[in-house]
């Protein structure tokens, strides 16, 4: 179907939803690299005007990647919640935006329709929204998940403690874990990106995390962010696996470039569930995503990178995850050039993920060769905290010495907690109080005398 829009003496034509969505996207380097971005600001506005008039039902009839060639498209269509969609089925994309911003779109009503919203609908409406719109609507979305604690409750923000080390040195990792715990981080998980893919090393790191969590009785979960096939093998060997991790993307071809498909993810989830390691819930999948991953694998099918990203959330949604996060600026300036593009993408990702019913966090980050700095990350972190982000990263000094990129620190998390009054997962907050690390108001006690005790228990 061809979509047309007249502006002045010019008629703009867009050949199908795929092109319409791409041309309506706010500027970013990845879409320019792919050759699918709008040629001018006027063409972008024309695309948005045409997109606003598209009925939501059209997204169920016109796939941006064909049903026959892509299992993610099949997942989206086959799992669509028609009863949930009924409440918004009469709306256009523009009307959907108006409804989302209205008082009628409450946390309860958004939860009822979330499974009826396809990723392309979410991506489409986001392209009509200013940053403040993305923040306001995401704030209304209530999404919780649970394993050893409860994540995503109103007025709370969690932190993944990220103690990476360039040589997977257990002492260095343990020191970073101690640093994070004393600063109140780690309720989302303690998650290590390993430098090695050797199963023996991964197993050692899993046992390290399990020992620390067990000895200190921390109500949290450990994760080593290795490939899902490695995790499956280690589960078979009896390793103490809490969360099953995998990077995912929004097309079948992109996921195959990662070495995964939906069947493998189902197998991994079932294996994780068989261990029964959760205490307050059984959400155990952890997914990471990021705009540009499909394009980097030449697996984007000329779909814009933000719509591809939203489609990755359909994959995540199928597996009831504990955690999902966009690593928003990690892929580099070829896909998100500067601070402005990273900030916009982070807000889009959080909005789309929450709208689709996911416990979405964001790694507020950039690479050292991007036109961005820590002030840009302060801005994005503050906006996401205002939007109710589920979790962020806690990296010592915000500088990941293994992955060589800049993220957010334990102190950055304390900043937004103070600014917005955000608490941690309730079970984790209670543990901090019992351990003497926080006072009765859940503020860190700053008791330096506890350092030797905790250090000795960590390395026991």
Language-model segments: what does each one mean?
Residues 1-176, 182, 187-460:
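Anaerobic metallocofactor- and corrinoid-dependent redox/one-carbon enzyme cores
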